Regions:
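Phosphate-binding/switch loop-helix module in NTP-utilizing enzymes
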Residues: 322-356
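Carboxylate/His-rich catalytic cores and anion/metal-binding grooves
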Residues: 193-199, 203, 259, 266-297, ...
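Conserved P-loop NTPase nucleotide-binding/switch module
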Residues: 342-385, 389-390, 402-429
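N-terminal accessory targeting/assembly segments
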Residues: 1-196, 207, 566
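Conserved NTP phosphate-binding and transfer environment spanning the P-loop NTPase/kinase superfamily
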Residues: 390-393, 399-566
């Protein structure tokens, strides 16, 4: 391995040369506290920045093993260190001068959720640390300005590493606080099963967000207060006792007037599948980790999904036990989303009537009289929601503001009034008894066997050079194959889409042979991430910073890839 001084001399030697001479810097260099690896050099100052990684051995990093002795605590510590490093380098970005992206210093931007990322990886076996970052190698026009890169690598970066990535430079109480919060969050997750709950929202939580485009907590928002009848007290290993609203297993209905906080509560529950950072307001909003948000999704593709539980006898005699379409309607898409969610192993569905297909959710009595059940191919969700829970153990939390039919099938009814929840189950049931319940002739409840087998796809693997493009949190483009993920609302970060793109390619290249079922393919992908780490999916020419998606989002991505056939 070359020394830091070797790198400095090399940079002096290529100053004022044409930009491609920067390629000669690729390699690893030993600095006093770390090894600097120049992994990829950009082609010109206007291209995507160069990729650089900082490697710190465990003895130098010196983080106590108690901070990362479980997977969840390790992810939380990695997240904390990444945020500290991002703050440390921010004042130096673009301080070095030049053309295009010269002087840029960048690292993954973490949101409010704590995610496993390839940008910061702590090895649990020896405590060593790797941080991946971007640096815009400076130039004037397309002429190397290596004296500016020397400033970055020798003046700016060492101090940033020293103060943000070494335990001795960090606040030990803050580091311990990250681990303690994680332990408490995991304790709540364990308590959900023990106490028969689908979710827990702590008293004092701040659920509203700052704006529609900001995930920061809203200032001066009304703190959450549990209704007494639903209040649960849990005992956490660090915080001690904590009280809040426990949502029981079964069918829960959230009602209330417009703008009173129904959807805000549901959105907090959607994100409760992730742990949140301290100060977010949702640190102690914990939802069943397998929860899936359901919605209608006009125009999505569906491949060989048995939706006969909800859709049957379509015009043209389409076989709904093996339904495929390139242009799904609202009701067929939502039916497929339910079945695919079951296949993905969910224990909880989250549904907002505002984003659902009305004819999929319920039919009123007048419509039943005008259009007979025998002429209606849709079995509405209200006719299956009890069976989903009683026969499959899948609970549902639904937001409703227009139809009262679900009062008859709900176990718990929560009314949001001026952002405060009230348990109105008894009153709602008493009132509902004065009205006839929804009834319809439905077919027996039968769950598909889930034997779909993804076929090999030349559209994903057929070219010599696979081109991958990720468009924010919206879609993945592999060669000419577009996977639209806009309706997968529990994806929170563009790097999760980078991860999904890498998983999709890995599955296409190594897993999908027409013999393995979709469940088996996803099992293999998860096993690889568990055993070899998320970074094992990294490959040249593909998105560089990955965040790990949940099992449910892996299924949702594969199900929405138009080029995949089952």
């Amino acid at each position: 391995m070359q020394s830091a001084n070797d790198l400095k001399q090399l940079l002096f030697g290529i100053n004022h040369k044409s930009y491609p001479a920067y390629k000669s810097t690729r390699g690893a260099y030993q600095f006093p506290r770390y090894t600097l690896s120049i992994d990829h050099v950009q082609g010109d100052p206007f291209a995507a920045p160069s990729r650089v990684s900082v490697h710190i051995n465990g003895k130098t990093a010196a983080f106590p093993t108690s901070l990362y002795d479980t997977y969840e605590k390790r992810v939380a510590l990695q997240d904390y260190l990444l945020r500290q490093f991002a703050r440390a380098i921010a004042p130096y970005s673009f301080r070095a001068k030049g053309s295009g992206k010269s002087g840029l210093l960048g690292v993954s931007r973490c949101g409010q959720e704590i995610l496993e990322r390839t940008a910061c990886v702590l090895n649990p076996s020896d405590g060593s640390l790797i941080v991946n970052m971007e640096i815009g190698f400076p130039a004037n026009g397309r002429t190397i300005a290596s004296q500016e890169l020397i400033r970055i690598l020798f003046d700016f970066l060492p101090g940033c590493v020293e103060k943000s990535l070494l335990y001795r430079s960090l606040d030990p109480k803050a580091c311990a606080g990250v681990a303690r919060l994680c332990e408490d969050q995991q304790a709540i997750r364990a308590a959900l099963k023990e106490k028969g709950l689908t979710a827990f929202i702590a008293d004092g939580s701040i659920l509203p967000r700052e704006t529609g485009v900001s995930d920061l907590p809203m200032k001066h928002a009304v703190p959450f207060v549990s209704p007494e009848s639903l209040r649960v007290t849990l005992y956490l290993p660090n915080r001690g006792s904590i009280s809040g609203m426990g949502i029981p297993l079964g069918v829960t209905l959230i009602v209330g007037g417009g703008f009173h906080g129904k959807s805000t509560l549901l959105q907090a529950l959607e994100r409760g599948v992730y742990n949140h950072i301290a100060g977010d307001g949702r640190e102690y909003v914990i939802t069943d980790a397998s929860a899936v948000k359901l919605r209608s999704e006009d125009s999505r593709s569906i491949s060989n999904v048995d939706i006969s539980l909800f859709i049957h006898d379509l015009p043209g005699k389409s076989d709904t036990t093996s339904f495929s379409t390139a242009d799904a309607s609202g009701s067929t898409s939502q039916a497929a989303n339910v079945i695919e969610g079951i296949e993905a192993g969910t224990s909880l569905f989250l549904i907002d009537e505002d984003t659902s297909a009305t004819n999929f959710m319920v039919r009123d009595e007048l419509m039943q009289r005008v259009v007979a059940d025998s002429e209606e191919p849709i079995t509405p969700f209200i006719s299956r929601v009890r069976d989903l829970y009683e026969k499959l153990g899948i609970s549902s939390i639904l937001v409703a503001g227009s139809s009262g039919s679900y009062f008859h099938v709900a176990d718990t009814v929560i009314q949001m009034k001026e952002y405060v929840p009230y348990d109105i189950t008894e009153r709602a049931k008493t009132t509902a008894a004065e009205f006839p319940p929804f009834t319809a002739s439905v077919r027996p409840f039968a769950v598909p066997s889930f034997q779909r087998r993804p076929q090999p796809s030349k559209a994903l693997t057929g070219s010599d050079r696979t081109k991958v493009k990720v468009m924010g949190r919206e879609s993945i483009l592999i060669n000419k194959s577009l996977t639209d993920l806009r309706a997968v609302e529990q994806l929170t970060d563009s790097e999760q889409l980078n991860g999904l793109a890498a998983l999709l390619l890995d599955a296409a290249e190594r897993r999908m042979d027409g013999r393995k079922t979709l469940v088996q393919v996803v099992d293999l992908l998860e096993r690889q991430m568990d055993e070899k780490g998320l970074a094992s999916l990294l490959a040249p020419g593909r998105p560089g910073d990955l965040a790990r998606p949940r099992r449910q989002e892996i299924f949702e991505c594969l199900d929405r890839c138009r080029e995949l056939k089952f």
